[in-house]
Regions:
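Beta-rich strand-turn-strand
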Residues: 142-143, 151-153
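Bacterial N-terminal signal peptides
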Residues: 7-15
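Edge beta-strand at a domain terminus
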Residues: 163-183
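Central antiparallel beta-sheet cores of small beta-barrel/beta-sandwich binding domains
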Residues: 50-144
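Low-complexity, intrinsically disordered Gly/Pro/Thr-rich segments
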Residues: 153-167
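Boundary at the C-terminal end of the N-terminal hydrophobic targeting segment
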Residues: 17-21
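N-terminal helix-cap/turn-to-beta initiation motif at the start of protein domains
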Residues: 32-49
Length: 183
């Protein structure tokens, strides 16, 4: 078991080792703890609104036609689970967020009304977060993204810098700014 923990730590270090956003330059990622999850839930809870080109949770990803208003509502259910509901454009999404003690990461899994499935892992990078996401589209195609998630809790703003390979149905880089409506 000890060897598995060491291996997972090494894999996470290699997997999450790249540094992209200015807010995180020079700051390595580290495995998440249950205490990090409690902090993450506090930062994420509430109703959020954004004017965005696309979101990672549905088939709007890669849209370049114009911005859409999206809403995201995160509710802390207990110390182990947060549920989410998102809506905007033509779709809605339901998700669950939890701490995975084996992966030492915060995991969010969601399914949208169009059949898009996404799984994101969040790990701390300094005081902020690094996220890797695997998206499975209804046709079976897979998209991989990574993001920096930057919370400004004092001002109720979360900025997400999303990076992908830029192919159809993905993004090269996109910045989404979410504003907390209420907790």
């Amino acid at each position: 078991m000890k060897h598995l923990s060491i291996l997972l730590t090494l894999v996470l270090s290699v997997t999450f080792g790249s540094v992209f956003a200015d807010d995180h330059k020079g700051q390595p990622v580290r495995p998440a703890t249950k205490e990090d999850f409690a902090r993450f839930m506090k930062l994420e809870q509430g109703m959020w609104r954004a004017e965005v080109l696309s979101v990672i949770s549905d088939n709007s990803l890669g849209n370049k036609d114009g911005k859409t208003t999206y809403y995201w509502h995160s509710v802390r259910q207990n110390s182990s689970c947060m549920t989410t509901l998102g809506s905007g454009g033509k779709n809605s999404i339901r998700g669950v967020t939890f701490y995975d003690p084996i992966a030492k990461a915060i995991v969010r899994t969601g399914v949208s009304s169009d059949g898009t499935i996404n799984k994101s892992t969040h790990v701390p990078r300094g005081k902020q977060w690094y996220r890797e996401t695997v998206i499975t589209k209804p046709d079976g195609s897979v998209i991989k993204l990574n993001s920096d998630v930057i919370h400004d809790d004092a001002n109720g703003v979360t900025t997400i810098i999303i990076r992908g390979d830029g192919t159809k149905g993905s993004v090269k880089e996109q910045k989404n700014v979410w504003y907390r409506q209420h907790e």
